[in-house]
Amino acid sequence: MMTSIDTRPSHTRAGLHMATRTRVLVSVNGDDRASFLQGLLCQDIAGQTPGTLRYGFFLSPKARILFDSWIGVLPDRILLSPSLFSKEEEEAFLAHLKKYLFFRTKATLASETGAFISASLVGPEALALATPLFDPEAEDEGVRRLSEGGFAFLRPGIGAFDTDAGGWIDLWLPAEGAGDRLKGLEDRVLSRGGQRLDDTGLEVYRVERGIPAVPSELNESHFPAEAGLDTLAVSYNKGCYVGQEPVTRLKFQGQLSRKLVGIRLDGPFVSEVTLPRHLLASNDNTEAGTLTSLVSSVVCGGPVGLAYVKRGHWDSGEPLIDGEGNRFEVSELPLLPRE
């Protein structure tokens, strides 16, 4: 049974998520750090100035998503923050990068995960609440230094469906003393009518906003464009990188056969829903897509989710079913009620 969580304070004020596991953070150092990443990421990194924050993917040669990452450019290094949270996942990420780190490349990799505690602020008041933490001399950039150590990533819009996520700021606080700083931040969030979000609450907020995530939506089965992230995460003007040819061909010569859409449960559950789950056309039971995320949303009035749905079935209002008789309906993203 899914737990219903009311995320309205996060959508109207702010939500604070204190990570139970620190998000992986890797630094790339050395004179060739930008050119090294330029040949791996689908995002343009070369020539970016310090303070720049970008989002991109590390792709397979067939342009399928292997890893996502926020990329923060600092004066002395480039920070990579993939959506990974365990030592094993970090080791796999580093192993992938090292495959392309040739002998003469003047670049080194280092884990910075253990030095920090991570947290996230979401909602329209996220920036106002985070500002007291910023170094007053820090530039107005996507990557901000914090006055007592650490830094913040101010995410731009996440995806074509949600160009303004209402504010999403990732914080990295030095592990020593992080507890007191986070407690002070939590007090400010609550005093302004916001809320603290646990892992389930942040997942509900994410799905309501229509934000695709690793591994549910972003994995080796999909291209960036299918998730609606090519505008945010892909540069079509840069030079060669792993997976470039299929990405470019899809953009200029092809068309999507499936894309990410919102899903609403139509009626009560007939059976328990496990993920991922095949979705069928309600009129003839042919394969129509795959349900990837499902949450119980107070804001949206019931269970909502995300799904990759095939062309011909992805229009809003399209009825779909699963193999157990549960009925769903395609919905526009984001899934929040229209004002």
Segments the model singles out, each with a brief description of its role:
Residues 1-68:
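Acidic, proline/glycine-enriched N-terminal capping motif
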Residues 15-18, 24-25, 70-212:
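Acidic, low-complexity central loop/insert segments
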Residues 27-33, 40, 121-126, 264-272:
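Short, surface-exposed ligand-recognition loops at beta-strand->loop->(often short) alpha-helix junctions
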Residues 30, 80, 121-123, 171, ...:
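Residue-level signal for inorganic ion chemistry
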Residues 40-46, 96-103, 135-136, 185-191, ...:
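Short, solvent-exposed amphipathic alpha-helical segments in soluble enzyme
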Residues 57-58, 127-147, 271-286:
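Short amphipathic alpha-helix segments
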Residues 61, 222, 228-234, 241-244, ...:
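Glycine-rich, small/acidic residue-mixed loop/short-helix segments
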Residues 172-264:
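Anionic-ligand-binding alpha/beta catalytic cores of soluble enzymes and soluble regulatory domains
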